[in-house]
């Protein structure tokens, strides 16, 4: 049984929902949930940024019915204008883990394994989403400011 919408990346690194037979293509993976959890911008606290007007945040969080809950992660904060130190890689892993925490709380997965490593001028991420039935891995090469 399909549980999510299929998302793919084209040669220009643009993301698209796939279409099949005139409808959104479904998948057994957690594509949309993963991408929204990572790339949706959780609002940074005032202490995390140098200027309060740079706190960002995904617009959909304005409509949350759960007080204090925001979709997304601080992934954006940990990958922009930072040096790629081992300490910052750990902060990035923590931001990703925090963004995916809701899937564990909702019983969609049982745990995550996240590893960030430096690659020529960027970051490689390995994200494993582990459920009782299967393990789904995603790999990303990210190029960020060093």
Language-model regions, residue ranges each:
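Immediate N-terminus of the mature polypeptide
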Residues: 1-98, 102, 108-146
């Amino acid at each position: 049984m399909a549980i999510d919408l299929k998302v793919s990346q084209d040669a220009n690194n643009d993301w698209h929902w796939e279409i099949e037979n005139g409808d959104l293509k479904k998948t057994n993976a957690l594509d949309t949930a993963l991408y929204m959890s990572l790339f949706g911008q959780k609002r940074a606290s005032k202490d995390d940024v140098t200027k309060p007007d740079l706190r960002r945040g995904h617009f959909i969080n304005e409509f949350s019915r759960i007080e204090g809950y925001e979709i997304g992660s601080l992934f954006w904060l940990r990958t922009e204008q930072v040096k790629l130190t081992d300490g910052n890689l750990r902060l990035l892993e923590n931001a990703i883990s925090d963004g995916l925490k809701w899937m564990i709380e909702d019983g969609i997965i049982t745990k995550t394994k996240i590893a960030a490593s430096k690659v020529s001028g960027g970051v490689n991420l390995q994200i494993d989403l582990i459920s009782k039935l299967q393990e789904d891995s995603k790999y990303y090469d990210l190029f960020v400011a060093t």
